Amino acid sequence: MSEEIKQETQEVQPPQKRKKKKLTKLEKWFRFMRRCYFSLGRLLVPIKKLGHTEKFNDRSYVFVGNHLSVLDVVPAAIALDKPVHFMAKKEIANNRIGKWFANKCECILLNRDGTDVRAVMLAMKYLKNGESVCIFPEGTRNKTDEIFLPFKSGAATLSIKTKTPIIIMVQCKKMRIFRRSYIYYSEPFEFTEYYNKKLTEDDIAAADEKLKQKMLEFYYQLSETIKNKKNRKK
């Protein structure tokens, strides 16, 4: 009899609640930054997302964008609900604020010439672990009248070697306080034609050029969209 009562008691026990995954320090930091942006920051730096505006949370991605200001990290940070590691020049850590930000965001710091094996290996490690990386292939902020500065190699190769899709983010004007900025996000794409083969210098150069042409295509597309919006307001 006691065994029957014990069995019935076991049967009516409520299901155990799943323990919530404990957030890492980096995940907590990015969650805090996004809350700050969506509660107040977007009033100061309003961004209109165009193109593929869904959240890119399903896997790791290589985010690639043109570089006009220090605010360029925002479009990548709000494109997903997970952390993203920014590749940046080591010089940003030369002052206290830059060093603090780089440490908090776990940025991947590069030598000025862009050739840094340790940094590349670290970026590959993050991507293989399901984390995303953001790269500005111009290597520095564009303060000229040219659409893009000459690209430094690396973004396409990183995507190919880790078989990680690329998402392009382009802007036509430098983001400013209290001015709406338009950011175009591409759909994810891959350079599958280079997978599972030994890359030559010609392959790398060709992949870099394809990436640049795609960015130019989306740049002109965004420029035309903005122009049409202005014409409709007249």
Language-model segments: residues:
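Non-catalytic C-terminal accessory region of glycerolipid acyltransferases
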Residues: S2-K25, W29, V120-K234
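Short, glycine/polar-rich helix-capping loops at beta-to-alpha or helix-loop-helix junctions
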Residues: M33, A93-G98, R176-F178
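Short, basic, glycine/proline-bearing loop/turn elements
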Residues: Y37, K104-L110, G139-K143
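Structural motif corresponding to alpha-helix initiation and N-cap regions
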Residues: K49, N95, V117-V120
